[in-house]
Amino acid sequence: MNQDTQSANTQQEKKIAYNFNKLQKRLRRNVGNAIADFNMIEDGDKVMVCLSGGKDSYTLLDILLNLKLSAPIHFDIVAVNLDQKQPGFPEHTLPEYLESIGVEYKIVEENTYGIVKEKIPEGKTTCSLCSRLRRGILYRTATELGATKIALGHHRDDMLETLFLNMFYGGKLKSMPPKLISDDGKQIVIRPLAYCKEKDIEKYSQAKQFPIIPCNLCGSQPNLQRQVVKEMLQTWDRQYPGRIETMFSAMQNITLSHLCDPSLFDFKGLKLGQVLDGVEGDIAFDKAEIPNQPLIQDEDEQTTDYGENGMIQFKQVQ
């Protein structure tokens, strides 16, 4: 190898390392902001990270472990995988990976695959029943482990897809919450990747070479409605840069008095002479001030924060 080739290789290696560090910093910042904005993790928490073997949950675990090293609070992490006894599931993959990084983990074995195959006709989407079964098992496991928070790997794009799915097919203005409490009040579920782009997670997963487990082992048909919405958003992202960022920002800037749900705003109770603090009544007659350009964020030069006041409260990233 001549000197010019060595120099070119060195430059390429430096560029790859630089881009990876920038990507990791961006993910850490977004996760830290989400944790701070929604008070996802508190001092003394035991966080149960649900690990499926896909890119999202691997990235979630990796970033949380990274933040834990220098967070201003103490919290513990335990990774949990549900082995649903799907044919061809590589049982050795996750234990080997988790042991290699030295994280506490538990593999829960439940034959939900058999239950789903028995209940759902061949060729139909099994995701709904499978999800309900998984939820119950994971709630039970969290209680057994003494976990105070259950962390899932849903990201910004998942939340937007769910918003449009509910609007298009369910007639509801509803998405995935970044933090929720179970119906019985015993479990708190958090989504620390709420501010993270799927494209960033894909790049990070490839760079880290996580041992990905395919998500189609169950043989279920894909959710066609979700796939349609996903492709729609991807098309918008290509054709109208910044639209995705603007839509996600809209989910955090809601004016209830300008929607139509009487259970959330007392339209019937409005009377002459009232002055309502924080209600933008007068602007109903004004022309809406809409920026000429959406919130544009280059995927490799992201500077805009979704976090509250743009501040990183959970973890200052250098």
Swiss-Prot record:
Gene Ontology MF term list: 4 iron, 4 sulfur cluster binding; ATP binding; magnesium ion binding; sulfurtransferase activity; tRNA binding
Role played: Catalyzes the ATP-dependent 2-thiolation of cytidine in position 32 of tRNA, to form 2-thiocytidine (s(2)C32). The sulfur atoms are provided by the cysteine/cysteine desulfurase (IscS) system.
Extra facts: The thiolation reaction likely consists of two steps: a first activation step by ATP to form an adenylated intermediate of the target base of tRNA, and a second nucleophilic substitution step of the sulfur (S) atom supplied by the hydrosulfide attached to the Fe-S cluster.
Name assigned to this protein: tRNA-cytidine(32) 2-sulfurtransferase
EC identifiers of the protein: 2.8.1.-
GO cellular component: cytoplasm
Top class in the EC scheme: transferase
Subunit structure: Homodimer.
Cofactor binding, note field: Binds 1 [4Fe-4S] cluster per subunit. The cluster is chelated by three Cys residues, the fourth Fe has a free coordination site that may bind a sulfur atom transferred from the persulfide of IscS.
Taxonomic source organism: Actinobacillus pleuropneumoniae serotype 7 (strain AP76)
Gene (UniProt): ttcA
Cofactors required: Mg(2+); [4Fe-4S] cluster
Record-listed [4Fe-4S] cluster binding positions: 127, 130, 218
GO biological process: tRNA thio-modification
Keywords associated with the record: 4Fe-4S, ATP-binding, Cytoplasm, Iron, Iron-sulfur, Magnesium, Metal-binding, Nucleotide-binding, RNA-binding, Transferase, tRNA processing, tRNA-binding
Location in or out of the cell: Cytoplasm
Motif (PP-loop motif): 52-57
UniProt similarity note: Belongs to the TtcA family.
HAMAP family, alphabetized: TtcA
Pathway the protein takes part in: tRNA modification
Catalytic reaction list: cytidine(32) in tRNA + S-sulfanyl-L-cysteinyl-[cysteine desulfurase] + AH2 + ATP = 2-thiocytidine(32) in tRNA + L-cysteinyl-[cysteine desulfurase] + A + AMP + diphosphate + H(+)
